[in-house]
Amino acid sequence: MAFVYRINIQPSLNSELHIMTKARKCLISVDATPYYHCVSRCVRRAFLCGTDDHSGKSYEHRRGWLEDKLLKLPEVFAIDVAAYAIMNNHYHTVLHINSSKAKSWCDEEVVERWHQLFNGNVLSQRFIRGDNLTKVERNRLQISINEWRSRLQSISWFMRILNEAIAREANSEDDCTGRFWEGRFKSQALLDESALTACM
């Protein structure tokens, strides 16, 4: 059984429905639309939630893993979760890229947010400690900050961190290794209000 969660976001989109079928690098474009429908599916008869009819084992607690991540990651990313639905072996989510939010962050906030996900690098650690950086070091750090700001508004990075975390927990619980997800997530741009409403 699916659990659907929605947040009311008022879209300002075109009136004509369009479906994008380009490669992923072209598919996700904030210039086209900030809204995307993403789907990830499990492999090897793995369970994301629900109960295995053969063994009787319940995996319903895994729903909580995914929900927790879906609600916490937007606190770090400039990406909002507009809706999601969790099925036994896959999940859907509607994501909204908030690029204006990412642009509003100062460099220090970008570094602090990135450090919630990764360790950063030596320069970013020194920067947060308040160490004095040389001009060359500051320029090098700025390159990293610009890249991190971009990643913090990237659906690919959002989904990567989300799915890797769930895969690690599930593989540990199942006492196995290998892929938990069926390849990379699938995404579709929601280019108008009709598409967004239908998906929600």
Question: Residues of each region from the PLM?
Answer:
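Short catalytic/metal-binding and nucleic-acid-binding patches
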Residues: M1-M200
